[in-house]
């Protein structure tokens, strides 16, 4: 198993010391041998999952090379679901409002793919990164047909993705320390390795107005710039240590803003000078995770740790915030701007919610996600005024018609 995948899956299973405390039952020995030998964190064993979610987690492990015999997969899933069930979480709030939505959801072909980020391509297709299956996927929502593409580097951990002007799909290889490019017409991949091996986890990519690719690298605490014409990569370090740069947007003036998920700050960077400026949020407990931008260049962010929606106006420095409808444990996550509103999902409610915040009235509207959502890590607006979502924990992608 590759080291980066082992580190990522470390959050899924308990330390070897917990082997002595695992309950008896069919599947215990397989879990003990296949899981506890690698993984040290016990977070998810402590919190628990439902059976469908455990099935997805086990298939993510299989994609990463976990030695679970095929005839034992169902037994392992049953064992985990029985002994480590999902614990109560906040109920999804129901707030009425003026908008109407229709959800269309599709299960992706490869079990345990963990769709991480979606992309609404210009041709109407929906792309996604299969983070734990090491692939990119393309869905034709008109037919429901999928096509999967696998980069040359196995288990590269495709994470964020973006389309260039020529229709190529660029993506971050979060486990391989690289940026990838796919030409969908030919299926040909090109990979660009980080010049510094310490930058192992490029995260969110985004093009500037001149076709230069910018990206965050979370654990490495860097911001990167890649020139597609030459392949040259420039890296700069975020001033605050362990700040964990995460989501990213670009303004009409070609200035990039990004969240610093490891601290209570936002930041901006000039792609020409690579100079970074940080902006401290009022509450020290804030941990902004994803970010969205309005046509007027006003920044919104999901305050994941506190259950708030935040607003920052770079023009005057003013900051505002609103409690998310699901409460302090709602875990606001993936977000975007669409039709005069900020849209985002609450990952901490069951089921996950789709939330609409009307910028004119400052009122919320919510909908439960039919499949449960399974943590919507990112979403994107389509050119025709709808939304696409990646639903990691339920192994689905979604198109939300907004009426």
Which role fits each region the language model picked out?
Residues 127-132, 169-175, 213-219, 256-262, ...:
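Conserved beta-strand positions in repeat-built beta-propeller and related beta-rich domains
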Residues 15-30:
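Electrostatic cytochrome c docking/interface patches
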